[in-house]
Amino acid sequence: MTEIVSRMSPIGPHLHYPDGDASLFWRNVRSSGEYAADLAEIKAEGERLRGQAPTGLTFSLFSQFAETGSRLEYERAYFERRRRLNTFALLSLLEPECEEHYTELLEAIWAICGEVAWCLPAHVSPERPLGETIDLFAAETGFTLTELRLLLDDRLPELLKTHIAGMVHARLFEPFLKKGPYEWEEAEHNWSAVCAGSIGSAALLLLDKDQDRELLGRILEKTQHSMTCYLKGFGEDGACLEGLGYWNYGFGYFVYYADLLYKRSGGELNWFAQEKVEAIAGFQQKCFLGGDAVVNFSDTLPYASVHIGLSRYISSIYDSVPSPPSRLRADYREDHCSRWAPALRNLLWREMAGNAPDWEPGDFLLEDAGWLISRTVSPKGVFGFAAKGGHNDEPHNHNDLGQFMLAGDGEFFLSDLGCGEYTKDYFGSARYTYDCNGSQGHSVPIINGCLQAEGSDRGASVLEQANGASESRMTVELSRAYDSQELQSFTRSWLWRKEELPSLELRDKFSFSKIPDTLVERFVTLIQPEKPSGQGRLLLVRGNFALELVYDDRQLQSEVTERTYRDHFGKDQVWYTLDFHVLQPQEQLELRFIFRFIS
């Protein structure tokens, strides 16, 4: 690493801009219709925020998490400060002649430099002083300020540039090298990529003098190790078990760092040459089930947009990764955490690949993850099906072996609740009492009163995975997920028929050592079911389609229950359980359901 660092190119505009011409780039952004929606969103935020004092980060707000377990109050104020910073930074780059933007920007930078800590209360530990705490957002903040220091360069007062550099050294570089190791340094999930990637990126953007080379080399050696650990969290199939949202987050910061590293090292350090990185890059397009509906196993939102910059950047590198449709571009205001790195690169990297009208149909077997995904396109519309095996100790784990979802024309008919409101208990011992996390909130059975248990030993065995032109199928063995002593085996089979209006056949086979007292099949939806005339049918109606659920009412008694849960944004959301009670449990039992789209 020492020799490579000694040969690194100087820091300059070539790290961000085509041909190194900043003024030409921003003139093009102002004049090109490609960016019109982005500019309107950024300017609207500027008008909303202009003249407002930065939101206060008081001790009482900071203490609320420790006292009540609630995160939202402090984080709303914290992220609003980042929104101010991002907005007036972008406006200052877009309209450098406007002194009002610049004045607001300086105040935003000064406010963030004045924060007692850049970390969130939820990530503070009594074992480590605040000044040494590096979490996701402390690392991101240092990366952001360092990048702004470079992009604005001589427009910033020298005092402020020196202050930013000093704070990044004190809050990131020195603790990273002298106060570790940090738990996230060898994490096999998004934390290693975001924390180490942000620190490594800040170093690549700040350390340029001869006397900085040794320090830069030490930081990069540790960062490279963390990136290796991050990639270990993926199988060769490239699936992100944390879900698409955390793919955008963790893999995004991996790419932001890898890009700067590649450019400063003149291509000598090239993460993009690894086959696994290419496989991970292809994960996003596999997740879309039609419209903005996405596979949302784990702590993931059910509907998603794309970071258009990140997506087009990786598409420009890999022929195997299609460019996303422009209509899925994330609105500038969408990111409630107001992250600078993707906001900037959604502009910087916009034109690195072209637009696509829509995702192509596709069937994807993710063998390491134990997922089957099918995106089916017919004259009637776009339909999606996804099912999973896996195990119950995945990152941001849900107890959900055998979970599946169905979507039609961008709407979910059978759902995964995804991520709930993040609180202290949500990541504590009470995690699986939350319906969105425990198996009670998933389309899996309750066996003899038992829900699924958590743990890496609670794993599914994939017995069959196959894709064909007209159908896709998967069979998994799931008995290890349950603590029911009488349960000897439980296999779940899905058969997805890719017709003009697709259908799914579900077969569950149970074997018990003695007859169970109860057995309940459960399916989860956000749609209030209708029970049409005739027996053995339920209808879920949304938009132009309905999903007809057909079952044997001689074998099963249906029960519909309306429930609520707190979503990721702290709002109560209604959902429904469709329970089917087995009327006469047996030692050997097979249950069959048909889910058929109708128009």
Give the predicted meaning of each segment:
Residues 414-419:
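Catalytic Cys-His active-site segments of thiol-dependent hydrolases/isopeptidases
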Residues 326-333, 422-599:
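CBM-like, beta-strand-rich accessory domains located in the C-terminal region of large
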Residues 1-41, 54, 77-79, 90-94:
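Extreme N-terminal leader/anchor segments
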